[in-house]
Amino acid sequence: MIKKLLIAPVRFYQRFISPAFPPSCRFRPTCSNYMIEAIQKHGAKGVLMGLARIFRCHPWSQPGEDPVPDHFSLKRNDTRKQSH
């Protein structure tokens, strides 16, 4: 029940506000979809994860995949392989 209440404003944004603007999210999944998935996985903490993601979504950030991690984290879940 609480998850549905937390997701409702995001769905409202997706349906009524987002279509009025050109796509601008630098990540996959989009920030709004990330927020929904984070809430589904982590409950109320998912809101914090979603807000942290929105703050990372700016013109100077590295675009790409940033899936919701299985464990709570406010950092980017970078799926690119890093070589050492």
Swiss-Prot record:
Keywords in alphabetical order = Cell membrane, Membrane
Give each disulfide bond as a residue pair. Answer: none
Q: Where in the cell is it found?
A: Cell membrane
The organism's place on the tree of life at top rank: Bacteria
Q: Which InterPro entries match?
A: Membr_insert_effic_factor_YidD
Q: What is this entry's stated membrane topology?
A: Peripheral membrane protein
Q: Does the keyword Nucleotide-binding apply?
A: no
Q: Which GO terms describe its cellular component?
A: plasma membrane
From the UniProt entry, list the residue stretches annotated as the region Disordered: 60-84
Biased composition, class Basic and acidic residues, residue ranges: 68-84
Q: What does this protein do?
A: Could be involved in insertion of integral membrane proteins into the membrane.
* Family the entry assigns: Belongs to the UPF0161 family.
Name the record gives this protein: Putative membrane protein insertion efficiency factor
The taxonomy runs: Bacteria, Bacillati, Bacillota, Bacilli, Lactobacillales
